[in-house]
């Protein structure tokens, strides 16, 4: 609303005089105080036939009313995920209108890509390294906040986004983009924001169902706007091996990504501050590899092969898997490599040693007379983790590959990807945490989107994730004690293509949209959300389109 202030030492008379003067001027100018109508005669100090000394003394003219604008306190920007803290202020906020542009502060040249992207999204010019002018958005590195944190300040018609690293500044630009998309503006005030968890993402199985590079790139763009930073790529399984290989081209499926396509995906991911985590699962889930190398297939004492399982008693088995781990460690620049370790079929029978005597003999030879098949499998995990560690990666593995009570213990440096408590070898999550292990949450109760809904899986809903799940809920619906929160590194939503024909790629993209959005909210800020689910869903539609 507009408020007019009348200035002067005598507010009462001045107000009255001003009101009269305005009324007079308005009446004589067709109702416009600054109109061009003919002015009425007014005392002018002297007039013909009148003594100056007899003229009435005129009061000093009252100042022209000066319009000023007052603003209510701003409210937090409406974004997904919600910002964690907003200091309200009075002011008009910011809109992307001329002469606004995007500039990068001195000593922040590394933010050029972020600046160009934001400028294009907002439809304003990118001016590069330049001093911020009226209406500009300035990106700057600096400060001592946590990794991926940022501060976004709207003041004096400008926006300034700062952070200790490029990722944090990038997330600030996502907040600005969403606020403008949803309401046309960014509210006045200061946003201070940072993620609750360092690993936040999506996992996609392209081994069972091929997805194109373009489809994957679209998911990366969606993830970036949700401030998600990790994309798990499961590209090897019984049904297919989906990335070209130089070391073993014989194992590659007809439908696959070329290395040029993978590099394009990786370049986009890097520009969006997303790490792509490759996964080659072993010693199970290797059917595509074994079709080209049947001599390495695990067979029981009767000679019956086990689907997807490699015979880990054979040195050639380790050689081929290690060849692949080294090849793709070089292709993928990120800091993690997922080595699988789940559902090894040799461990699902009543007596692994009796059914697979070659594995039992190899275990005793390598780890001593008390060792069994479980120990050989655990040693396999440690050996594969050592290969990717030598390439500069942190190994990840599924939780049912970490066994209790054996001669061999899984390396403490391997991150536990907790997905289920239902498989043989799986333990309650508190056991892993009590051992001091770090865990990433992929709870199949909430975060598994399994095509065709086999084995009693149902498609997860965003509402259920939003209302019931937190990173502490690792298994089923029960959270682990809050004291373990620092060991839980984050979470990913996972797409598995068990019945590949059940949905088209477009249906998958649509089906995971709201569950992934809900996950993004809960890993950015694990506290109880302030919006109801219906409010959140409406907001997500507004800011994401």
How should these model regions be labeled?
Residues 3-11, 15-17, 21, 29-37, ...:
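Acidic, contiguous N-terminal accessory segments
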Residues 28-50, 54:
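Signal peptide processing junction and immediate N-terminal pro/mature segment
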Residues 149-336, 348, 352, 499:
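Feature activates predominantly on carbohydrate-active enzymes
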Residues 199-203, 230-232, 273-277, 336-338, ...:
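Structural preference for beta-strand elements that scaffold enzyme active sites
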Residues 207, 236-240, 279-285, 342-344, ...:
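Active-site beta-loop-alpha junctions enriched in small/polar residues
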Residues 307-415, 419, 424-431, 435:
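Active-site neighborhood of glycoside hydrolase catalytic domains
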Residues 395-400, 407-545:
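Flexible, acidic glycine-rich loops studded with aromatic residues
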């Amino acid at each position: 609303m507009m408020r007019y202030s009348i200035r002067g030492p005598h507010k009462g008379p001045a107000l009255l005089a001003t009101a009269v003067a305005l009324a007079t001027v308005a009446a004589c100018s067709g109702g416009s105080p600054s109109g061009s109508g003919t002015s009425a005669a007014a005392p002018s100090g002297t007039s013909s036939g009148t003594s100056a000394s007899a003229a009435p003394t005129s009061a000093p003219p009252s100042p022209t009313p000066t319009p000023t604008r007052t603003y209510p306190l701003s409210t937090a920007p409406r974004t997904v995920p919600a910002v964690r803290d907003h200091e309200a202020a009075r002011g008009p906020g910011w809109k992307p209108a001329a002469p606004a542009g995007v500039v990068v502060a001195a000593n922040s040249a590394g933010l050029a890509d972020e600046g160009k992207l934001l400028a294009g999204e907002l439809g304003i010019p990118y001016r590069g390294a330049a001093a911020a002018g009226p209406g500009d958005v300035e990106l700057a590195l600096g400060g001592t906040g946590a990794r991926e944190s940022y501060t976004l300040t709207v003041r004096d018609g400008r926006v300034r986004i700062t952070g200790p690293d490029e990722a944090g500044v990038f997330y600030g630009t996502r907040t600005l983009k969403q606020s403008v998309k949803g309401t046309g503006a960014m509210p006045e005030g200061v946003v201070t924001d940072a993620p609750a968890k360092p690993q936040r993402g999506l996992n996609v199985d392209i081994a069972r169902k091929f997805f194109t590079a373009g489809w994957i790139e679209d998911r990366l763009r969606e993830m970036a706007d949700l401030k998600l930073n990790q994309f798990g790529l499961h590209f090897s399984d019984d049904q297919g091996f989906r990335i070209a290989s130089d070391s073993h081209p014989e194992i590659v499926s007809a439908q696959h990504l070329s290395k040029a396509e993978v590099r394009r995906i990786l370049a986009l991911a890097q520009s969006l501050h997303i790490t792509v985590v490759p996964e080659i699962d072993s010693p199970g889930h290797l059917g595509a590899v074994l079709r080209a190398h049947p001599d390495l297939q695990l067979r029981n004492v009767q000679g019956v092969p086990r689907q997807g399982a490699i015979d880990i008693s054979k040195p050639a088995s380790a050689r081929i898997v290690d060849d692949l781990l080294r090849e793709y460690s070089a292709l993928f620049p990120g800091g993690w490599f997922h080595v699988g370790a789940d559902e090894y079929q040799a461990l699902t029978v009543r007596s692994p040693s009796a059914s697979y005597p070659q594995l039992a003999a190899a275990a005793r030879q390598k780890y001593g007379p008390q060792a069994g098949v479980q120990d050989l499998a655990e040693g396999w995990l440690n050996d594969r983790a050592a290969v990717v560690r030598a390439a500069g990666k942190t190994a990840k593995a599924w939780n049912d590959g970490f066994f209790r009570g054996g001669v061999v213990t899984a390396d403490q440096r391997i991150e536990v990807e907790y997905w289920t408590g239902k498989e043989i070898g799986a333990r309650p999550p508190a056991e892993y945490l009590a051992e001091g292990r770090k865990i990433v949450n992929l709870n199949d109760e909430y975060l598994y989107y399994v095509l065709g809904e086999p084995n009693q899986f149902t498609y997860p809903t965003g509402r259920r994730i939003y209302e019931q799940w937190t990173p502490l809920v690792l298994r089923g619906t029960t959270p682990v004690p809050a004291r373990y929160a620092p060991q839980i590194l984050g979470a990913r939503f996972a797409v598995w293509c068990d019945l590949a024909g059940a949905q088209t790629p477009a249906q998958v993209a649509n089906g995971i949209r709201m569950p992934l959005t809900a996950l993004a909210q809960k890993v950015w800020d694990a506290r109880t959300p302030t919006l109801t689910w219906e409010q959140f869903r409406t907001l997500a539609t507004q800011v994401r389109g």
